[in-house]
Design a protein with these regions (language model features):
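Short Gly/Thr-rich strand-loop-strand
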Residues: 40-70, 86, 95-134, 173-198, ...
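Short, surface-exposed beta-strand/loop micro-motifs that present aromatic residues
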Residues: 74-82, 125-132, 200-223, 271-273, ...
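Extended intrinsically disordered, low-complexity coil regions enriched in Ser, Thr, Gly, Ala
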Residues: 95-117, 144-166, 226-260, 296-314
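A surface/extracellular/periplasmic glyco- and lipid-processing/surface-interacting theme
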Residues: 138-195
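A short acidic-to-branched-hydrophobic micro-motif
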Residues: 67-107, 138-140, 207-213, 217, ...
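Bacterial N-terminal signal peptides
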Residues: 8-17
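Boundary at the C-terminal end of the N-terminal hydrophobic targeting segment
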Residues: 19-25
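Bacterial N-terminal signal peptides that target proteins for export
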Residues: 1-9
Length: 314
């Protein structure tokens, strides 16, 4: 009996160890580089772990945003130049649970399209670097301007991340024509400020329009760029998407206007109208998605871009 009990325990322990190994779980603090650092740099603080309860102690003003995106835990560290003590780099690595949420946080902090060439997508300027890879979002800040050094640290961290999850598939659905690079964002709730749209992606596009040249000749027209947006709202099934479209129609009829124009040529479950704040809008249902374009000037531009979008959605 005693022998049998120990045999069962050993088997259970073996299964547990195998499950842990096969899950690919990586201790978060192991992602902080300690060796092969850029010349003259040393780790002086950390790794320090934060969880959902303690994150506010570290980034009080931004903690709520991270929690909305599914924050699990993070690790913080500080590096220092041995020759110049005030020259430091702070690093934060956030476990966001999955690649969609990691991209979402990254997309909210990226100010413009300045890729650094590390992770699945990245941003790099004189004092800061950020990127996402798998379920991780990484931010680094330098007290002194040195983008090359920021790139080195970012690449060291990216190499330590074994999560090989691809980028969110929805990013590839957005048409390339007229697209403003680096503008796609993911929102876990309240897409476009509408709670009924729930979670989804939005991207910015540029439409060429004629504007009056007020400096040279008031009667002379020139070409300028006007921004508008495409969005993709995600629901659990087609019925929920259809219900959201009905709510959108009711909301638009109260605050703006709904066009009686037929949209049979692009789908029976469709909505066209004008929002008092966001401009002209067209919304279509495709499966468990709602696709839309809003803020465009020319009908042809809005309809063509939305048609491309709908074709790309699988």
């Amino acid at each position: 009996m005693f022998h049998r009990t120990w045999t069962v325990l050993f088997i259970l322990m073996g299964i547990f160890v195998w499950c842990e190994a096969s899950s690919g779980a990586t201790p978060l603090d192991s992602l902080i580089p300690r060796r092969d650092l850029p010349g003259g740099w040393v780790l002086i603080h950390g790794p320090q772990i934060y969880n959902k309860k303690t994150l506010f102690e570290h980034i009080n003003g931004q903690a709520e945003l991270y929690l909305k995106y599914g924050f699990r835990q993070s690790v913080f560290a500080i590096y220092q130049d041995k020759k110049k003590a005030q020259n430091q780099i702070e690093v934060d690595i956030y476990d966001m649970g999955n690649v969609v949420q990691a991209f979402g946080v990254f997309s909210r902090f990226r100010n413009e399209d300045r890729p650094g060439g590390f992770g699945l997508d990245s941003y790099l300027d004189d004092h800061s670097a950020s990127f996402y890879k798998g379920k991780y979002f990484v931010m680094a800040y330098a007290t002194e301007s040195n983008p090359d050094l920021m790139s080195q640290f970012s690449k060291l961290i990216a190499l330590k991340i074994s999560d090989s999850s691809p980028p969110p598939k929805e990013i590839s659905y957005f048409p390339k024509s007229g697209f403003k690079a680096g503008s796609i964002q993911y929102f876990p709730e309240g897409l476009l400020g509408h709670q009924f749209l729930k979670r989804g992606f939005q991207g910015t596009y540029v439409e060429e329009v004629e504007v009056k040249d007020k400096i040279e000749d008031k009667n002379k027209a020139k070409t300028g760029g006007k921004e508008f947006n495409l969005f993709l709202a995600i629901f659990k099934d087609s019925q929920e998407a259809m219900n959201a479209l009905k709510v959108y129609k009711d909301d638009l009829s109260k605050k703006g206007k709904v066009s009686p124009e037929s949209l049979i040529q692009i789908g029976t479950n469709a909505l066209k109208g004008e929002d008092p704040y966001q401009g002209k809008v067209i919304v279509l249902q495709k499966g468990f998605y709602l696709l839309g374009v809003l803020g465009f000037e020319k009908e042809e531009v809005g309809e063509n871009r939305l048609a491309e979008f709908m074709k790309n959605v699988k």
